[in-house]
């Protein structure tokens, strides 16, 4: 879908109070100023979309809401996922993070809760503090060097294949219903 040696970062999901996409946009602009060949693809919408569109340029693209299959097709063609969640947000393992894990892409991560940090160990990742643009830039430069590191595919599939997970839930419900 894409050509060239550009490294493509992507964000999937809601653009609202809990999600720190502004730091990512500012960070990508700094990376461009530093001569890095990067793009940011933001798929999703929400109350912050119009405010964030001020950062749109040739390398930062906002798609708005897309059908799930189209969103995943674009994400597959990208290189690095961005899990940009504010430190004040209460989210744990989000649908967004589940999709990122299923795609088995390296992740730039600002979430700090233990269960998310445990999952991050299954693939190349760099953590940064939400709201810290310079920290994001440094994490991005680090992950650019490590984006081809190994991924624990079998374990990710075991934990995130929805058909497998849902069947386990169905089996549990059926077992409980028969007790």
Annotated model-derived regions:
Residues 13-19, 92, 128, 157, ...:
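Glycosyltransferase donor-binding loop in the core domain
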Residues 131-135, 144-177:
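A charged, aromatic-enriched C-terminal amphipathic alpha-helix characteristic of glycosyltransferases
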């Amino acid at each position: 879908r894409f050509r060239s040696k550009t490294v493509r970062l992507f964000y999937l999901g809601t653009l609202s109070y809990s999600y720190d996409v502004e730091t990512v946009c500012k960070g990508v602009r700094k990376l461009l100023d530093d001569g890095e060949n990067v793009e940011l693809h933001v798929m999703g919408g929400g109350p912050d979309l119009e405010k964030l569109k001020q950062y749109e340029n040739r390398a930062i693209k906002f798609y708005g809401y897309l059908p799930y299959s189209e969103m995943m097709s674009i994400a597959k063609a990208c290189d690095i996922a961005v899990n940009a969640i504010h430190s004040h947000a209460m989210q744990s393992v989000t649908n967004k993070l589940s999709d990122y894990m299923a795609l088995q892409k390296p992740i730039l991560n600002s979430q700090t809760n233990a269960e998310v940090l445990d999952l991050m160990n299954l693939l190349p990742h760099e953590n940064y503090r939400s709201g810290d643009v310079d920290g994001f830039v440094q994490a991005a430069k680090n992950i650019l060097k490590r984006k081809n590191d190994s991924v624990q595919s079998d374990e990710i599939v075991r934990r995130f294949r929805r058909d497998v997970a849902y069947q386990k839930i169905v089996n549990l419900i059926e077992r409980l219903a028969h007790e």
